[in-house]
């Protein structure tokens, strides 16, 4: 079972450290992802795999939200055009969601590694 409080806490850590990394050189986005994933994995506990999963979700959370929003917008826009537009809007929305989630998961690999370490430390 996913511990969403751990995922959201890790996401907030990534967000805050990412913003700090824009202003203060040396911290960077990679460190933000690693530390946010570490926090998510540590809070979730349960070992390597559970920490990896929670770190991955924390790192990919923004992309997953974007994909869900694109899915809804494209599907609704398609239905506004008509029945055929609804079919194409649904296909476009589903495609956008799958692409966004896939890219978010790839970009969140550093967070997943941090989460695995955090899961081991917990």
Feature map (PLM): residue ranges:
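Juxtamembrane/disordered regions of integral membrane proteins
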Residues: 1-58, 64-122
């Amino acid at each position: 079972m996913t511990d969403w409080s751990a995922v959201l806490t890790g996401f907030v850590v990534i967000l805050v450290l990412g913003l700090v990394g824009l202003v203060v050189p040396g911290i960077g986005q990679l460190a933000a992802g690693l530390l946010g994933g570490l926090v998510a994995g540590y809070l979730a506990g349960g070992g390597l795999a559970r920490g990896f999963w929670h770190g991955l979700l924390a790192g990919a959370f923004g992309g997953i939200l974007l994909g869900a929003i694109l899915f809804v917008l494209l599907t609704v826009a398609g239905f506004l055009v008509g029945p055929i537009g609804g079919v194409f809007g649904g296909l476009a929305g589903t495609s956008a969601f799958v692409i966004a989630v896939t890219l978010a998961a790839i970009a969140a690999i550093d967070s997943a590694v941090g989460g695995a370490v955090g899961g081991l430390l917990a």
